[in-house]
Amino acid sequence: MTKRTASIKRQTTETTISLSLNLDGSGQAEMCTGVRLFDHMLSQLAKHGLFDINVSANGDDIHHLVEDVALTLGKAFNEALGERKGIVRMADATVPMDDSLATVALDLSGRGYAVVDLPFSKNDLTGFPTDLVRHFLETFAIEGRLNLHARILYGSNDHHKAEALFKALARALDKATSLDPRREGIAPSTKGMLEN
């Protein structure tokens, strides 16, 4: 089996990022972005998606940092998926976190698009602006070339809402990136191929 991995380095005048991804990992996470809550959410993605993800990143502000990590992670997923042959392709997950419930449905179609409904009660999660959760998901979907629908259904604690959302994203990505032995070597599309 071909290794489904990617390593990407990105350096701009605003950020420096080094990221590695193994789609067939065991949930190992090493995150160092300097933003503790962001590291925590990225670790949820690795742990509950069973992806090995290492991120080392720094930037001139939190917006540029989150945006460029999302961009780099999306590119890494796209690269690791290759021609996307044999994958399940479409999946969804609904995940509770105490008072909160979030759902994610996605299609690794090769076409980046995001529909995001995130009713946070305020724009702050211990120093992390909640509007950056939306921006992360939209950027990740576009660069990862996946159709993503993400919604927080309800909850009273914004941290729990965000964590349920990242866990749902992880579970849906794990299912969608899984290899189906019945589709070995075949693109899961009536077109016979998926964009990459």
UniProtKB/Swiss-Prot annotation:
The gene is hisB. One of its GO terms (molecular function) is imidazoleglycerol-phosphate dehydratase activity. Keywords: Amino-acid biosynthesis, Cytoplasm, Histidine biosynthesis, Lyase. It catalyses: D-erythro-1-(imidazol-4-yl)glycerol 3-phosphate = 3-(imidazol-4-yl)-2-oxopropyl phosphate + H2O. Pathway: Amino-acid biosynthesis; L-histidine biosynthesis; L-histidine from 5-phospho-alpha-D-ribose 1-diphosphate: step 6/9. NCBIfam families: PRK00951.2-1, PRK00951.2-4, PRK00951.2-6. Coiled coil: none annotated. It is an enzyme of class 4 (lyase). Transmembrane segments: none annotated. HAMAP family: HisB (MF_00076). This is Imidazoleglycerol-phosphate dehydratase. One of its GO terms (biological process) is L-histidine biosynthetic process. Its EC number is 4.2.1.19. PROSITE patterns: IGP_DEHYDRATASE_2. Belongs to the imidazoleglycerol-phosphate dehydratase family. InterPro entries: IGPD_sf, ImidazoleglycerolP_deHydtase, ImidazoleglycerP_deHydtase_CS, Ribosomal_Su5_D2-typ_SF. Its main location: cytoplasm. GO terms for cellular component: cytoplasm. It is found in: Cytoplasm.
